[in-house]
Amino acid sequence: MEILKHSVIQNMHKNGLIGIVRDNNEADAMVRTRAIMDGGVTILEISMSTPGALNIIETIAKEIKEKNLDVYVGAG
């Protein structure tokens, strides 16, 4: 866990940006999340006020793993 924490902190310092996704519906939030990733943002926070937030996080985490991306996603 310390290694992951250190990696996330290094990534934050390097890029200076966290993409925060908050929307009123799950489908739009998923589209926005993917667009943010495609734009090169590597740390993402999905707001828990977004409907389906946990599903979005789970789906994006699977995509990150399948594509072996250096992207971090979590809840906020």
Predicted regions and their residues:
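Conserved N-terminal beta1-alpha1 strand-loop-helix module at the mouth
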Residues: 1-74
